[in-house]
UniProtKB/Swiss-Prot annotation:
The keyword Iron-sulfur does not apply. SMART domains: B41, FERM_C. The keyword Thylakoid does not apply. The modification N6-succinyllysine is found at K83. The [IL]-x-C-x-x-[DE] motif is a proposed target motif for cysteine S-nitrosylation mediated by the iNOS-S100A8/A9 transnitrosylase complex. This is Moesin.
Length: 577
């Protein structure tokens, strides 16, 4: 049994360990990786490794892993990376996993400044990256400092502005809040839609020379070949779409491109090393094949993948809508509960007030009852005295009668009796007056008692009403491989058909131009960052970008411009650079 070989493959967000046989091919290892991570859009990707000369190289799929120039270490180290880029991410990247791998790789390129990104776009992209990681902003969860552990902006951008970490976080947070309701997967796609408009996105640069020996850059991307001046990798000067190229070949350091236009001369340039020409050839073949494939109807497999992706997206949207609905219901229930609690507290307070009023009324009633009793006793005393006076008056009357009788009987003592009579008469008069006074007082006491009785009845009625108020019940709660040959030359025919004439990429506009929301955000960010910018720290790329903006250029306008004229004119222009 042959001894197995340990292999470690690092994707953009995972580390995979495999044990392979000595005869395992690059394709077998590649297939094992894509199966493990659930990736079906395999045509964009490849396995990268550092060879024995420390050059970054793509693993050849048709050769054994052990037969290639991989460093003999344990485990063997590979990176799973995107080798080819789509023309339009929203049209071509189907699976969420594909979009995520591109997102992470592009983000890394932007943060490392391998892809130039202006400051305002960098902040906007950072907000989409935050949305994809954290979801909707929630002030209860995302407290101050929640982005402290995240690298979100290129070091160049941080150094060019007089803003501290908290101030950067505040700005990113504002835009994070703007993306409320956006699915994490949609935030990833929005990030890529903006990033693909960056001039250096998806471009592989190679240092070349023309026949004159001028130092230039060759850019190989999804749309064709572009030529750049040595000091400007943002603005290509000449462009050749894949649809104009018939054959590509190299012999040692010389690279030859034959155009479809037979009247046009060969497009020749020189690379510093043979291995670079091998890589250019592999990239040209892969990008050309994908360029042609895009201009044909989708294969059954791609159609199925798109249908499945649509279904999955629809399912996620349904789940999201359901979650949002549940969230709203929960929030409404919480508000209703708070309202009920508030009403309960108000009713309890009202009940307390009623109890206090009842207690006060009870005390007043008791006081009035006591006062009524006192007045009744006083009335009884006055009545008793009146009765006593009446009795005394009667007795005086009787005495008077007796005296009169005595007067008749005793004429002798008439004068004396007359005198006594006068006295008794005066006494009777006094007693009569006293009786009338007492009767008047008794009547007054009677009236007061009657008034107190009426107040008492009224208070009893109020108390009865208060006591009959119902008790408030508490409410219820609710590949293309690089050539294997050791030879110093290789050639590839780039087949073309009727679809090759489709150059729809020249009609494209940037996301900022067609999306008013993105345009508005970028304008606001440009204005916001201008005050904090340190102009002395501008880089060459910053100045080139600013000049392009001033002239109204963007990636696609430049593309249209550099493809003007026939192939011969552009090759002549390249030779004269």
């Amino acid at each position: 049994m042959p001894k197995t070989i340990s292999v470690r493959v690092t994707t953009m967000d995972a580390e995979l360990e495999f044990a392979i046989q000595p005869n395992t091919t690059g394709k077998q290892l590649f297939d094992q990786v894509v199966k493990t991570i659930g990736l079906r859009e395999v045509w964009f990707f490849g396995l990268q490794y550092q060879d024995t000369k420390a050059f970054s190289t793509w693993l050849k799929l048709n050769k054994k892993v052990t037969a290639q120039d991989v460093r003999k270490e344990s485990p063997l180290l590979f990176k799973f990376r995107a080798k080819f880029y789509p023309e339009d991410v929203s049209e071509e990247l189907i699976q969420d996993i594909t979009q995520r791998l591109f997102f992470l790789q592009v983000k890394e390129g932007i943060l490392n400044d391998d892809i130039y990104c202006p400051p305002e776009t960098a902040v906007l992209l950072a907000s989409y990256a935050v949305q994809s990681k954290y979801g909707d902003f929630n002030k209860e969860v995302h407290k101050s400092g929640y982005l402290a552990g995240d690298k979100l902006l290129p070091q160049r951008v941080l150094e060019q502005h007089k803003l501290n970490k908290d101030q950067w976080e505040e700005r990113i947070q504002v835009w994070h809040e703007e993306h409320r309701g956006m699915l994490r997967e949609d935030a990833v796609l929005e990030y890529l839609k903006i990033a693909q408009d960056l001039e250096m996105y998806g471009v592989n640069y190679f240092s070349i020379k023309n026949k004159k020996g001028s130092e230039l850059w060759l850019g190989v991307d999804a749309l064709g070949l572009n030529i750049y001046e040595q000091n400007d990798r943002l603005t290509p000067k000449i462009g050749f779409p894949w649809s104009e190229i018939r054959n590509i070949s190299f012999n040692d350091k010389k690279f030859v491109i034959k155009p479809i236009d037979k009247k046009a001369p060969d497009f020749v340039f020189y690379a510093p090393r043979l291995r670079i020409n091998k890589r250019i050839l592999a990239l040209c073949m892969g990008n050309h094949e994908l360029y042609m494939r895009r201009r044909k109807p989708d294969t059954i497999e791609v159609q199925q993948m798109k249908a499945q992706a649509r279904e999955e997206k629809h399912q996620k949207q349904m789940e999201r809508a359901l979650l949002e609905n549940e969230k709203k219901k929960r929030e409404l229930a919480e508000k209703e509960k708070e309202k009920i609690e508030r009403e309960k507290e108000e009713l309890m307070e009202k009940l307390k007030q009623i109890e206090e009023q009842t207690k006060k009324a009870q005390q007043e009633l008791e006081e009035q009852t006591r006062r009524a009793l006192e007045l009744e006793q006083e009335r009884k005393r006055a009545q008793s005295e009146a009765e006593k006076l009446a009795k005394e008056r009667q007795e005086a009357e009787e005495a008077k009668e007796a005296l009169l009788q005595a007067s008749r009987d005793q004429k002798k003592t008439q004068e004396q009796l007359a005198s006594e009579m006068a006295e008794l008469t005066a006494r009777v008069s006094q007693l009569e007056m006293a009786r009338k006074k007492k009767e008047s007082e008794a009547e007054e006491c009677h009236q007061k008692a009657q008034m107190v009785q009426e107040d008492l009845e009224k208070t009893r009625a109020e108390l009865k009403t208060a006591m009959s108020t119902p008790h408030v019940a508490e409410p219820a709660e609710n590949e293309h491989d690089e050539q294997d040959e050791n030879g110093a030359e290789a050639s590839a025919e780039l087949r073309a058909d009727a679809m090759a004439k489709d150059r729809s990429e020249e009609e494209r506009t940037t996301e900022a131009e067609k999306n008013e929301r993105v345009q508005k955000h970028l304008k606001a960010l440009t204005s916001e960052l201008a005050n904090a910018r340190d102009e002395s720290k501008k880089t060459t790329n910053d100045m080139i970008h600013a000049e392009n903006m001033r002239l109204g250029r963007d990636k696609y306008k430049t593309l249209r411009q550099i493809r003007q004229g026939n192939t011969k004119q552009r090759i002549d222009e390249f030779e004269s650079m």
